[in-house]
């Protein structure tokens, strides 16, 4: 059995942990969603994951 190492999403207020092999990689930082990776531009709130209401 292989274990997966999860890392915290690079969006500071985000609560999500992501698998680096499935995350969005921007400049070596791993994000759980495009909203987080884009810095919540345009006032987007939340990353779409249950229980997380990050706003960048």
Swiss-Prot record:
Domain of life: Bacteria
Position of the signal peptide: none
Disulfide bonds listed in the record: none
Gene3D superfamilies reported for this sequence: 2.30.170.10
Keywords attached to this entry: Cadmium, Copper, Mercury, Metal-binding, Metal-thiolate cluster, Zinc
Physiological role: May play a role in essential metal ion homeostasis (especially zinc homeostasis) and resistance to certain non-essential metal ions. Binds four zinc ions.
Similarity annotation: Belongs to the metallothionein superfamily. Type 14 family.
Segments forming a coiled coil: none
Binding site for Zn(2+) 3: 14, 47, 52, 54
Residues given in the record as Zn(2+) 1 binding sites: 9, 14, 32, 36
Residues annotated to bind Zn(2+) 2: 11, 36, 40, 54
Induction pattern: Upon exposure to a range of metals, particularly cadmium, zinc, copper and mercury.
Classification of source organism: Bacteria, Bacillati, Cyanobacteriota, Cyanophyceae, Synechococcales
Gene Ontology molecular function, alphabetical: metal ion binding
Listed name of the protein: Metallothionein
Residues the entry annotates as binding Zn(2+) 4: 16, 32, 47, 49
InterPro entries per record: Metalthion_dom_sf, Metalthion_fam14_prok
